[in-house]
Amino acid sequence: MKIAYLMRHDITKNDGVTKKVLDQTTEWKKSGHTVQVFCYVYNKGKSIIVDANQYKIRPPLKNKFVLENDLLKDLEVFSPDVVYYRYSTLNRTLRKVLSKYKVVTEVNTDDLGESKLLWEKERNLKSFARYFTYTLFRSQILKKVQGIIAVTKEIAELPSTTKYDKPTVYIPNGIDLEKYQTIKKQNEAYERVGLFFIGSPNQPWHGVDIIEEMSKKLPQYDFHIVGMEGDSSENLFWHGYLQKDEYLKILKKCQICIGTLALERKNMKEACPLKVREYLAYGYPTIIGYEDTAFLENDVDFILKLKGNKVSDEAIEKIGSFIELVKKMVVTSDLIQNIDIIELEKRRLSFIEDIFKN
């Protein structure tokens, strides 16, 4: 097949999303398919997706109503069998694409639910416009696609997804395990157990406040937070934003990692974040506050799933027991094959091929 990967994202930042797209398209090419990335960016620049076609995002109104003729011409020359669209908002160019090509869309979030929560919290014009836009245009996209791939079972089963009666499958995020070397050492000496978290500011569902509370109730352990600023204490250390080589130095001193702890604040129960896949690939048992899509069918002893977003005495007891149980454990690649991108992309390609043939 010839697959056009259409997306709107700043791929010049070479962030987790960019790495995911690179890994996906690399696997597709290995399977014998011809793939080209077509990407809207704010500023053109170098990217790890070196052969991507980049198109500068216009101001909001122009972006909505003016055709991106360069992109449409490039698509026509490429002549894809299927367009794989990383779901975003609707514009006039996308309308053209939806009317001309077979389109499979990848849905990564409950955008309606998230934008509604933001509007209820902020009550300003910007958040209302966002919610209104998603509500108005979502149906116009999903009505016209030929297939939907959600990253979680929860998203795949939302009424706002199922109401369009489209072929739908859920495939969680994965990573290329061959690119990761185990960092955690099984018998390495350490004075105190360290727990590691990395995230971004202003994301209340990360549950950083829960980590702060954990540090107070578990003073015998050290907690390291990367990606945001704060006031450090005797056992809670805020490191701010760090480049990868810098935060890996901190990770190497830790024994356990922490993922998102308060996903319920987004009215969601299930997720599959890339950072948790990286924790596991580096060998670290992990504490999370949600159901992970890749582990819905089986409980594993290297993941602790906390319920609720409050640090009760019962939760603290579970956390303490888990830490003592796994502090010397190393998660090996044979235990996490269900997050390996090779197997996940085989499933994705099978779904895309079914759409193409039908």
Can you say where each PLM-predicted feature lies in the sequence?
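Acceptor-binding helix/loop patch of EC 2.4 sugar-transfer enzymes
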Residues: R8, T12, V104-L136, T162-D165, ...
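Membrane-proximal helix-turn-helix segments that form the acceptor-binding/catalytic region
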Residues: T26, E68-K73, T93, T105-S115, ...
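Short N-terminal targeting/anchoring amphipathic segment
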Residues: L72-R92, Y101-V104
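Nucleotide-sugar-dependent
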Residues: N14-K19, N202-H206, D245, K249-I250, ...
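Carbohydrate-associated surface elements
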Residues: E154, G174
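A charged, aromatic-enriched C-terminal amphipathic alpha-helix characteristic of glycosyltransferases
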Residues: K307-K357
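Conserved catalytic-core segment of nucleotide-activated headgroup transferases in glycan assembly
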Residues: V17-E27, D176-K179, E191-S232, F237-Y247
